Amino acid sequence: TARPDRADRALDRDRAVSPYALPDGNVQIAFSGGRTSAYMLHQILETNGPLPERVCVSFQNTGREMPQTLDFIQECSQRWDVPVVWLEYQPEAPRFQIVNHNSAARDGEPFEALVRKKRYLPNRVARFCTAELKAHCASRYARSLGWEAWFNCIGIRADEQRRISAQPLKERYQHWRPLVAAGVSKRDVSAFWRRQPFDLRLQNINGRTPLGNCDGCFLKSEANRAALARDHPERYAWWVRMEAMNDSTFRPAEPYKQL
């Protein structure tokens, strides 16, 4: 019939003008498990329809994400019918492993394995945790697919330009930031989730999620880390244990045990 043809033509037009239209070539979509990256994934799916084989959606689990984050990723995958590859760092070759919602680490095991291998703690200057647990883990998986080059799709909004870094010179991927091109702000993301039948079950404070990503990250404010210690002492204890194990601190002269 003619109706599918009209729908296909409309989709082609949307792809031609939309900032969410997939670029040519291989694409790795980074899904952090937060509201912004989930919104980005939704918009990409709305524009392009089912993703072709040259596109993969991946989540790199550090083991320090809140359980609600893991559940949210799984729910997005199921509701939107999009496969998500769950990855974790491992110290042995190929230095990543594929897991799933059921088998994913929930007590910082990948993070601890990295700290034990490095024999020192990451900090605000040497953020090897982000590099190894997230970026390099994703790149190693992409290389395992036989990809020589690809686009790395990341969920940075137009209102957080300070987070935009220069293109890494030695990497095989190019950054793709559709939310920046679309002019998306945190207000847009919050408005989207108010309209949805489900949401990330973590507190949203003016577009920010204090317990998002790594629960006790040393880049978070003292107030956020103190709230974790107060409300989730069993989770906060992991950060204290890492400092004791290394006889060092994540932040200079600010040991976690003193909060």
Please report, for each region that a protein language model flagged, where it lies by residue.
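Nucleotide-activated chemistry modules centered on ATP-dependent adenylation/adenylyltransferase
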Residues: 1-259
